[in-house]
């Protein structure tokens, strides 16, 4: 029996509609329109597509967007100076620096320069730390989007065994914190994990984000598990696939996210929610 598909596109549209309604309500209440500043350095085609998608979502939600497209040759000092200006700009509620940055730039230093209350990606150590101590302020977009999907499909992590494959600062680590917050029993697997297949086989909820096509084999999946595939990989033939071997996994899982159309749309919807939240922080 094939797994039920978790439709991130459908859930994200509902979330975007809710943001649009909240923005319209703010305007009726004479509160300022939320504003997102997006910074793109260099000409990476995939990054340009992501930035364009974010601007389109802003338009759908009634959120103002400012775009800063900088040349590949931009120095660390120039980029930090722009972040400093945006930090003190009262019109700007959220700042997003599109990753990856060119190799000569220090991404971590740039992310740490963003004011935590404008860090709508949720990458600043302050925001990750608040999540770790159960006091979230700005929650990282992809992990929060995953939790929204679980909620939308009536999946309560409480008491479940959750396994996160991948320990990146962007997905794996904050995802584990989100699942802990939801009272799951959480295991994090990484490059030094032994017997990965055995760890995966014990998961009631499996979240995979390693950036390697078909890394998790379908036969590893516990029958009846919920599988959330965060990976998005472009193959040589131009098609997209996730980090989980989808065709075999869907014959064992109860629910599974497709790639594309699963987690990806939720990341952008959460970014819009975080920008709205940032605006509310700046109302006072």
Swiss-Prot record:
Q: Name one GO molecular function term.
A: methylenetetrahydrofolate dehydrogenase (NADP+) activity
Whether NADP counts among this entry's keywords is: yes
Q: Which SUPFAM superfamilies match?
A: Aminoacid dehydrogenase-like, N-terminal domain, NAD(P)-binding Rossmann-fold domains
Which pathway does it operate in?
One-carbon metabolism; tetrahydrofolate interconversion
Provide the binding site for NADP(+). 166-168, 191, 232
Catalysed reactions listed for this entry: (6R)-5,10-methylene-5,6,7,8-tetrahydrofolate + NADP(+) = (6R)-5,10-methenyltetrahydrofolate + NADPH; (6R)-5,10-methenyltetrahydrofolate + H2O = (6R)-10-formyltetrahydrofolate + H(+)
Q: What Gene3D superfamilies does its record include?
A: Leucine Dehydrogenase, chain A, domain 1, NAD(P)-binding Rossmann-like Domain
Listed EC numbers = 1.5.1.5, 3.5.4.9
Q: How does it assemble?
A: Homodimer.
Q: Which family does it belong to?
A: Belongs to the tetrahydrofolate dehydrogenase/cyclohydrolase family.
Q: Which NCBIfam families match?
A: PRK10792.1, PRK14186.1
Q: What is this protein called?
A: Bifunctional protein FolD
Q: Which organism is it from?
A: Neisseria meningitidis serogroup C / serotype 2a (strain ATCC 700532 / DSM 15464 / FAM18)
**Gene it is expressed from:** folD
